[in-house]
């Protein structure tokens, strides 16, 4: 490929916040799509669809490679999301389950799913157009290039944007019904910084991508009782930050079958005693740190990185086959608004 920006390249990332930034004239707002992050490199008939972690997504979405050749300009590098929309109860919504099923080793199954639930590409940034790199250009310039690069036909689209903070906040509520994931804010004058958390994301819940580093068997003896979760510190150590529990009986058995192949021999480790139940068995089975899950949580506790953990048990949302374990770090976590206690109380 003869492009000014070559694969692989890390996408620019987002830092979670609890509130949509509202400085007028500073930010551009757009929906947060619930799919697989993807970078598209096109040079004539050569098309590469790269995942967030630098891997080739093209083999899983062959129908999309054809669409990208047909609906993008001949020479470009775009950032966007691969999604699968489906008609669900009379409305078109994003379907995460259909999307995640595409990450499968069997080419025959991929071919069948490509016909049954074809994928779309949603473009939301441009890294290059023609022979010109746009990495150092402000987003307002890259946005114009994106509109020029995509011929909105059937499978490739450009996401909506607005510079109105009130509309960005409204989208956080209104677009949830279509299966979207929240709102992204980008600095209008900001360059594209690969691998840096320069964008802001505001989601409908606080979530985190965690490494499944171990599990405990359910007290009944059948299936998974809890999945133990880890995040990588800056020194490269995987730190346990809590666990996800409260699975149905059916899911407990299914999760055990999914996690058993990752066991590190027959080793069992002793866990910290429970502050709620001194009789609870806290032994756990360690796993190779290869599988990533998305969880929803309420708060973190602890003042140092070494002591930070989820305050309560978290909710398991889904596996993230598009995530690398090494990307599960503390810097993805939401930073709560900084309030002094007395600022919350009524003035006397």
UniProtKB/Swiss-Prot annotation:
It catalyses: ATP + (deoxyribonucleotide)n-3'-hydroxyl + 5'-phospho-(deoxyribonucleotide)m = (deoxyribonucleotide)n+m + AMP + diphosphate. Its cofactor is a divalent metal cation. Keywords: Ligase. The keyword Nucleotide-binding does not apply. GO terms for biological process: DNA recombination; DNA repair. Pfam families: DNA_ligase_A_C (PF04679), DNA_ligase_A_M (PF01068). It is an enzyme of class 6 (ligase). It comes from the Bacteria. The active site is at 32 (n6-amp-lysine intermediate). Its EC number is 6.5.1.1. InterPro entries: Adenylation_LigC-like, ATP-dep_DNA_ligase, DNA_ligase_ATP-dep_C, DNA_ligase_ATP-dep_cent, DNA_ligase_ATP-dep_CS, NA-bd_OB-fold, OBF_LigC-like. GO terms for molecular function: ATP binding; DNA ligase (ATP) activity. Disruption phenotype: Not essential; a double ligC1-ligC2 mutant grows normally, no effect on NHEJ. In a triple deletion with ligD NHEJ on blunt-ended plasmid is 90-fold impaired. In quadruple ligB-ligC1-ligC2-ligD deletions NHEJ on blunt and 5'-overhangs is 0.22 and 0.12% of wild-type respectively, only 4-fold decrease in 3'-overhang NHEJ. Belongs to the ATP-dependent DNA ligase family. DNA ligase that seals nicks in double-stranded DNA during DNA replication, DNA recombination and DNA repair. Has weak intrinsic nick joining activities and accumulates DNA-adenylate. Acts as a backup for LigD in the Ku-LigD-dependent NHEJ pathway. This is DNA ligase C1. The lineage of its organism: Bacteria, Bacillati, Actinomycetota, Actinomycetes, Mycobacteriales.
